[in-house]
UniProtKB/Swiss-Prot annotation:
Transmembrane segments: none annotated. Plays a role in virus cell tropism, and may be required for efficient virus replication in macrophages. It comes from the Viruses. Belongs to the asfivirus MGF 505 family. Pfam families: DUF249. It comes from African swine fever virus (isolate Warthog/Namibia/Wart80/1980) (ASFV). Signal peptide: none annotated. This is Protein MGF 505-3R. Keywords: Early protein.
Length: 280
């Protein structure tokens, strides 16, 4: 069959119901047969049928690339599959010629990283950009919840205080709470209180509460009184009129009287009303 006729069939037939008399041999001639999987048919923009079973086109592309099946990869890309999945699949199975063939359609490895679950593949993907540093890898590991990457480089990070602090604050801003706990607990950071600044600025009550869980445990284990620290942050959130943060600080031991005094001074009526209702 001529290549032009095959291309025409590949473009037109997938949107139609395939005739029953199309056996594997005919489908192979048409380029619509996937070895070890079966017939291929495009049914929607993002969906195909593989041996009459529906599958997302990008998932199919990832599998085809992991098998090193250039023909099927090309077919699925012509059906508007996302080339990032071709790179991921090829990386997982170490088809590096295929990786470099399709990476050019993506250009930035950082656009691929969110699709990857395996830490080894994640690091390989990041290495596709030869200009990126380890610090860049660590930042994207935090943003994509790839804790095993940080665990692998624990000894390296343990000697790099600046980077640990930067990653800690990034995890706080991106609401990666598991990362926040791990970085502080394993690597240690010089300025834990930066967490509270970020939490208050971003109105992130969960991070704010997590910060107290972390820092109070440290203070109590050292036999230190946390009252000064609690009231320091209580003043900050009271001045800003952040009632949920005020209540959370009081819950951990902050002074209700300080909150009421500052609410009166800065005329935060919603805070005063809350405490009036509470007391009544």
């Amino acid at each position: 069959m001529s290549s032009s006729l095959q291309e025409l069939c590949r473009k037109k037939l997938p949107d139609c119901i395939l005739p029953e008399f199309f056996d594997d041999y005919v489908l192979q001639l048409l380029g619509l047969h996937w070895q070890d999987h079966g017939s291929l048919q495009r049914i929607e923009k993002n969906q195909i049928l593989v041996q009459q079973e529906p599958i997302h086109i990008n998932e199919a592309l990832k599998v085809a690339a992991s098998e090193g099946n250039y023909e099927i990869v090309e077919l699925l890309l012509s059906w508007e599959a996302d080339p990032r999945y071709a790179v991921v699949g090829a990386l997982e199975s170490k088809y590096y010629d295929l990786v470099h063939k399709y990476y050019g359609q993506v250009k930035d490895c950082h656009d691929i990283l969110p699709l990857i679950q395996n830490p080894e593949t994640f690091e390989k993907c990041h290495e596709l950009n030869s200009t990126c540093s380890l610090k860049c890898l660590f930042k994207h590991a935090v943003m994509n919840d790839m804790l095993p990457i940080l665990e692998k480089y624990t000894d390296y990070l343990d000697r790099w205080e600046y980077c640990s602090q930067m990653l800690f604050e990034l995890a706080c801003r991106k609401k990666k709470y598991e990362m926040v706990v791990w970085i502080e607990g394993v690597l240690g950071v010089g300025k834990v209180t930066s967490l509270f600044t970020i939490a208050i600025s971003n109105r992130d009550l969960q991070l704010y509460s997590l910060g107290f869980s972390i820092i109070l445990e440290k203070l109590y284990s050292c036999g230190q009184d946390p009252t000064f620290l609690l009231n320091h942050f209580l003043r900050d959130v009271s001045i800003k009129g952040l009632l949920p943060f005020v209540l959370k600080t009081i819950e951990y031991g902050g002074s209700k009287e300080i909150a009421i005094t500052l609410a009166k001074k800065y005329q935060h009526k919603h805070i005063l009303k809350y405490f009036e209702t509470w007391e009544s």
